[in-house]
Protein backbone atom coordinates (compact mmCIF):
# COMPACT_ATOMS: atom_id res chain seq x y z
CA UNK A 1 0.00 0.00 0.00
CA UNK A 2 2.85 2.38 0.72
CA UNK A 3 4.02 2.04 -2.91
CA UNK A 4 0.62 3.27 -4.07
CA UNK A 5 0.89 6.30 -1.78
CA UNK A 6 4.39 7.14 -3.07
CA UNK A 7 3.26 6.82 -6.69
CA UNK A 8 0.11 8.89 -6.04
CA UNK A 9 2.02 11.69 -4.28
CA UNK A 10 4.72 11.84 -6.93
CA UNK A 11 2.14 11.62 -9.71
CA UNK A 12 0.12 14.50 -8.28
CA UNK A 13 3.18 16.74 -8.14
CA UNK A 14 4.35 15.64 -11.60
CA UNK A 15 0.94 16.32 -13.13
CA UNK A 16 0.77 19.83 -11.70
CA UNK A 17 4.32 20.56 -12.90
CA UNK A 18 3.40 19.30 -16.35
CA UNK A 19 0.37 21.60 -16.43
CA UNK A 20 2.51 24.60 -15.41
CA UNK A 21 5.12 23.87 -18.09
CA UNK A 22 2.32 23.74 -20.67
CA UNK A 23 0.95 27.11 -19.56
CA UNK A 24 4.38 28.75 -19.52
CA UNK A 25 5.40 27.44 -22.95
CA UNK A 26 2.14 28.59 -24.55
CA UNK A 27 2.65 32.06 -23.06
CA UNK A 28 6.26 32.18 -24.24
CA UNK A 29 6.03 30.55 -27.66
CA UNK A 30 2.34 30.42 -28.59
CA UNK A 31 0.22 27.37 -29.44
CA UNK A 32 1.58 26.61 -32.94
CA UNK A 33 3.88 23.77 -31.83
CA UNK A 34 3.43 21.54 -28.75
CA UNK A 35 6.39 22.99 -26.82
CA UNK A 36 4.92 21.95 -23.47
CA UNK A 37 4.90 18.24 -24.32
CA UNK A 38 8.30 18.53 -26.00
CA UNK A 39 9.75 20.29 -22.94
CA UNK A 40 8.37 17.90 -20.31
CA UNK A 41 9.55 14.89 -22.29
CA UNK A 42 13.10 16.28 -22.53
CA UNK A 43 13.18 17.39 -18.90
CA UNK A 44 11.72 14.05 -17.85
CA UNK A 45 14.29 12.16 -19.94
CA UNK A 46 17.12 14.05 -18.26
CA UNK A 47 15.60 13.58 -14.81
CA UNK A 48 15.06 9.83 -15.21
CA UNK A 49 18.77 9.43 -15.89
CA UNK A 50 19.71 11.72 -13.00
CA UNK A 51 17.28 10.10 -10.55
CA UNK A 52 18.32 6.57 -11.55
CA UNK A 53 21.96 7.35 -10.74
CA UNK A 54 21.09 9.25 -7.57
CA UNK A 55 18.89 6.45 -6.24
CA UNK A 56 21.41 3.75 -7.14
CA UNK A 57 24.47 5.54 -5.73
CA UNK A 58 23.22 7.62 -2.81
CA UNK A 59 20.11 5.81 -1.64
CA UNK A 60 21.10 2.14 -1.95
CA UNK A 61 18.63 1.54 -4.79
CA UNK A 62 15.69 2.55 -2.57
CA UNK A 63 12.47 1.10 -3.98
CA UNK A 64 10.46 3.74 -2.12
CA UNK A 65 12.38 6.62 -3.68
CA UNK A 66 12.13 4.98 -7.11
CA UNK A 67 8.33 4.71 -6.70
CA UNK A 68 8.08 8.36 -5.61
CA UNK A 69 10.42 9.98 -8.14
CA UNK A 70 10.51 7.77 -11.23
CA UNK A 71 7.16 5.99 -11.30
CA UNK A 72 5.17 8.76 -9.60
CA UNK A 73 6.74 12.17 -10.29
CA UNK A 74 8.09 11.45 -13.77
CA UNK A 75 5.12 9.25 -14.66
CA UNK A 76 2.82 12.19 -13.93
CA UNK A 77 5.15 14.75 -15.51
CA UNK A 78 5.79 13.13 -18.90
CA UNK A 79 3.26 11.53 -21.17
CA UNK A 80 3.65 9.49 -24.32
CA UNK A 81 -0.04 9.74 -25.18
CA UNK A 82 0.14 13.55 -25.35
CA UNK A 83 3.21 13.23 -27.57
CA UNK A 84 1.24 10.98 -29.94
CA UNK A 85 -1.81 13.26 -29.99
CA UNK A 86 0.36 16.31 -30.65
CA UNK A 87 2.07 14.47 -33.52
CA UNK A 88 -1.25 13.51 -35.12
CA UNK A 89 -2.61 17.05 -34.64
CA UNK A 90 0.41 18.46 -36.46
CA UNK A 91 -0.01 15.88 -39.26
CA UNK A 92 -3.69 16.72 -39.69
CA UNK A 93 -2.72 20.27 -40.63
CA UNK A 94 -1.56 18.78 -43.93
CA UNK A 95 2.17 19.46 -43.69
CA UNK A 96 4.10 16.33 -42.72
CA UNK A 97 7.39 18.19 -42.21
CA UNK A 98 6.48 19.52 -38.74
CA UNK A 99 5.29 16.22 -37.27
CA UNK A 100 8.33 14.42 -38.69
CA UNK A 101 10.63 17.05 -37.20
CA UNK A 102 8.76 16.89 -33.88
CA UNK A 103 9.07 13.09 -33.62
CA UNK A 104 12.73 13.05 -34.67
CA UNK A 105 13.67 15.91 -32.34
CA UNK A 106 11.75 14.45 -29.41
CA UNK A 107 13.39 11.05 -29.77
CA UNK A 108 16.86 12.35 -30.59
CA UNK A 109 16.99 14.98 -27.89
CA UNK A 110 15.17 12.66 -25.45
CA UNK A 111 17.84 9.98 -25.77
CA UNK A 112 20.50 12.67 -25.41
CA UNK A 113 18.78 14.01 -22.30
CA UNK A 114 18.80 10.56 -20.68
CA UNK A 115 22.54 10.24 -21.38
CA UNK A 116 23.09 13.74 -19.98
CA UNK A 117 21.08 12.93 -16.85
CA UNK A 118 23.06 9.72 -16.31
CA UNK A 119 26.35 11.59 -16.76
CA UNK A 120 25.36 14.36 -14.35
CA UNK A 121 24.14 11.76 -11.86
CA UNK A 122 27.44 9.89 -12.07
CA UNK A 123 29.36 13.12 -11.64
CA UNK A 124 27.27 14.27 -8.66
CA UNK A 125 26.81 10.97 -6.89
Curated annotation (Swiss-Prot):
GO terms for cellular component: plasma membrane. Na(+) is not transported, but it plays an essential structural role and its presence is essential for fluoride channel function. Pfam families: CRCB (PF02537). GO terms for molecular function: fluoride channel activity; metal ion binding. It is a multi-pass membrane protein. It catalyses: fluoride(in) = fluoride(out). The chain crosses the membrane at residues 4-24, 32-52, 68-88, 100-120. Na(+) binds at residues 75, 78. It is found in: Cell inner membrane. Fluoride-specific ion channel. Important for reducing fluoride concentration in the cell, thus reducing its toxicity. NCBIfam families: crcB (TIGR00494), PRK14195.1 (NF010791). This is Fluoride-specific ion channel FluC.
